[in-house]
Amino acid sequence: IVGGSVTTIGQYPSMASLLFNNRQVCGGVIINNRSVLTAAHCPFGDAVSSWRFRVGSTNANSGGTVFTLSTIINHPSYNRWTLDNDISIMRAASNIGTSASVQPAGIAGSNYNLGDNQVVWATGWGATSAGGSLARFPGVNARHVQIWTVNQNTCASRYAAIGRTVTANMLCSGWLDVGGRDQCQGDSGGPLYHNRIVVAVVSRYTSWIQSNA
């Protein structure tokens, strides 16, 4: 998280740290007593046995509870080149349970109305400056940052200028024309909260999530 501040798992008990070969590389969010939602580009092509997730801890690399996985379900229409439909469900091999620091998140439904310029919060354990490598991740305390939703047409035109396509399945956020706040390497797959509800792209996938989680 760039431009944010330290937070705690008590403030965001649905956060999950995704571990590849026991090393934090992505974020996720608890959605029920067995599943974590993340981005498909995180586990795509990997063996299920290479992944675990940690819940209930402010620290990405210690504390809380670590779960092995029974399966990883990537969205069937995920496109690894355009990152369209970039969503995945990691199912734990055992029940996650709940506590003050472990809670499933509420997920925006298909009728959730998220306007432009709305305050949203991104959370994660990733790099705190642009260009931070995996080896330099702070990996200590969870961080959060306040950003804002960006108009879809504005976002699409900005990305088109650098040869990237923004689809209707994507949600844009940041600090438009100011910058300095955002998610970064290692935050991929983590939640974007609007009034404590996970929004990001999930409102377009609610039925798929419910069917597979």
Swiss-Prot record:
Domain of life: Eukaryota
Main location: secreted
Regulation: Sensitive to serine proteinase inhibitors and thiol proteinase inhibitors.
Compartments where located: Secreted, Extracellular space
Entry's family note: Belongs to the peptidase S1 family.
PANTHER family: FI18310P1-RELATED (PTHR24276:SF98), POLYSERASE-RELATED (PTHR24276)
The protein, known as: Achelase-1
